[in-house]
Amino acid sequence: MTRRMIISIVVVACFSRVPVARGQDASAWDGQFHAAARLIAGAAGQTADTKWLRAGIEIRLDPGWKTYWRYPGDSGVPPTFDFAGSENVQSITALWPAPERFADGAGGQSIGYLGDVVLPLRVVPKDASMPSLLRVKLGYAVCGNLCVPAQAQLDLTLSAKAGAEESMLVAAEDRVPRPIQLGSHDQAGHRLSVQSVHREIDGAHERVVVEVAAPEGEPVDLFAEGPTADWALPLPEPTKPANSAPGLRRFIFDLDGLPPGAKADGAMLRLTAISPTDAIEVEARLD
């Protein structure tokens, strides 16, 4: 499947007044095709005036198998979530730990996870004094020598009490790229920053140039997404920066893969920069 055939994430939250049981630590595993998935529960959290419950989807893979990030690159299928049937749920936000780039076996490159992964969820209950029942139909793909689709149907009752999987969820959340501003230096302790984004013409091709600042000698990768899921931008490739400042990395990619009728002018790109010690996310406008 090419990047132009990528399906978007579907997140559907349903609400119910039906009372649910007390919280659990994890659902049963649902597995097939060299992979299995389950829901896990953590403790309650709060951001500003919003109270939420920590949960996650844990995916276990056989050795040598892999699965995909929200944007899978040149080939692959991102996970999809259908939360229809959940009870006492106002909203659900899926978080994505930092992925890595790997060869897709067909001459292209994909983005995903080379091994087990936990995808954190933040669940906002309709009534925070009551448990919430989380139901999800998960669709995803797993790849070894061949790629196969996988599905799981999972349910778990969540409460505000910390469960046995709290530390696993916190560790997964720590790997989620943090949003920072374009051009920021050492914001909130981050070692990475996206310094500039601009377009340039190279012969008949228009391309995007991104400069990333990082500690000298530390490997860095960069991924680019468009404003909607039907954008299929190529993976940025590293190149030698015009500025020889220590730690400055330059990435380029052709301005290709736009959906029919879409215009690059003014489009907001989401850029994810990753190193062994940091992961950040930056929004940048193409002017």
Residue ranges of each PLM-predicted region?
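Positively charged n-region of N-terminal signal peptides that target proteins for export
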Residues: 1-4
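Bacterial N-terminal signal peptides
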Residues: 7-17
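Extracellular/lumen-exposed scaffold segments
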Residues: 22-287
